[in-house]
Amino acid sequence: MLKLIAPTIMLLPLTWLSKKHMIWINTTTHSLIISIIPLLFFNQINNNLFSYSLSFSSDPLTTPLLMLTTWLLPLTIMASQRHLSNEPLSRKKLYLSMLISLQISLIMTFTATELIMFYIFFEATLIPTLVIITRWGNQPERLNAGTYFLFYTLVGSLPLLIALIHTHNTLGSLNILLLTLTAQELPNSWANNLMWLAYTMAFMVKMPLYGLHLWLPKAHVEAPIAGSMMLAAVLLKLGGYGMMRLMLILNPLTKHMAYPFLALSLWGMIMTSSISLRQTDLKSLIAYSSISHMALVVAAILIQTPWSFTGAVVLMIAHGLTSSLLFCLANSNYERTHSRIMILSQGLQTLLPLMALWWLLASLANLALPPTINLLGELSVLVTTFSWSNTTLLLTGSNMLITALYSLYMFTTTQWGPLTHHITNMKPSFTRENILMFMHLSPILLLSLNPDIITGFTS
């Protein structure tokens, strides 16, 4: 794992030692080279030889998420150039350092084999994200959003620490591999039920589950572009990853404890999709659509079949790329119109035809049109929820319909219609932006040719 962690850490001195005109080029090219390294983890003859150490290891569940994390750093750097154009050099370097340190803590979270180390890095991801939101957000409300984000996540994850200490005292180890091999079946008791809640609540807040989701729209709307991209694409996936890892230890409690949360996630999926239909703020709409997609992932993980785990991993990767792309497009609109309100940026297709094409492709990917991997993920989850209970087909089917409605509503409102009067001086789309959109879309389409890469450890 050092071959991935060490080059990422070396991005920090590279950032601070780069000259003014080279800072973007150096960080982008080096982070792109680093994003190739996780591809090596697929070619493992024997898992123990290459990727396992006492502290960090990778497996087919970790590797797709590592690919997503490393792929997104160069994209966030490319997306942030315009946002930081008026900042002094030291602030640019600090911003990039925050993004790099966030990536380091994410890589270590995904690869940690000790659960206490996993918990420490899981919490460490909060600090750079909080600094990015509260320092570089656009509106004064960013401080309120940062407070919501911090306290929701901390309150959710403190019981997890207590549960981990309890597990260590009873079993004598917190190594994930040892626990999965030696885990005993937990008897159904009040204490064990509370421990199950403590284990899963931290991840349900992070996902977020409907009812615990209030921090997410605030954080998304107030965050700068890189904050929104990392939050939607990778930080929400920490919740899914943690749940999948720890569900193996908590059997068979999940079977009867999961019912209320399954019902809540399926209900929340419909609710947040419906809320998206009534949004006027573009970033808020994308944030609520994220909650809706992650509710499907929660449902899939709680059902606990190999097919549902596969669907959850595919949907997490697909959603990470799609939501990041949508935030990039929303940011390109915001940089030109200086407004997130959709009605004020309508009719942009006549001025930016190529950007309208990216909008169309992103909207179609969001509503899971073939041949995107979003369709594979949604169909897998839909089939598993149907096999768990036939009545869920009504909910998941209507959710797919509402998703199509708000995706097309978002596209038509921003691209069609008459131009508004305040749009007088509009810059054309830059090559940097077009490359950025292409680099988001190409994995979504290419992974559908070989989805084995991202189907997780159950394939």
From Swiss-Prot:
It is found in: Mitochondrion inner membrane. GO terms for biological process: aerobic respiration; electron transport coupled proton transport; mitochondrial electron transport, NADH to ubiquinone; mitochondrial respiratory chain complex I assembly. InterPro entries: NADH4_N (IPR000260), NADH_Q_OxRdtase_chainM/4 (IPR010227), NADH_UbQ_OxRdtase (IPR003918), ND/Mrp_TM (IPR001750). GO terms for molecular function: NADH dehydrogenase (ubiquinone) activity; ubiquinone binding. One of its GO terms (cellular component) is mitochondrial inner membrane. Keywords: Electron transport, Membrane, Mitochondrion, Mitochondrion inner membrane, NAD, Respiratory chain, Translocase, Transmembrane, Transmembrane helix, Transport, Ubiquinone. It is a multi-pass membrane protein. Its main location: mitochondrion. Its EC number is 7.1.1.2. The keyword Hydrolase does not apply. The chain crosses the membrane at residues 22-42, 60-80, 94-112, 113-133, 145-165, 196-216, 224-244, 257-277, 284-303, 308-330, 351-371, 391-411, 435-455. Core subunit of respiratory chain NADH dehydrogenase (Complex I) which is composed of 45 different subunits. Belongs to the complex I subunit 4 family. Core subunit of the mitochondrial membrane respiratory chain NADH dehydrogenase (Complex I) which catalyzes electron transfer from NADH through the respiratory chain, using ubiquinone as an electron acceptor. Essential for the catalytic activity and assembly of complex I. This is NADH-ubiquinone oxidoreductase chain 4. The gene is MT-ND4.
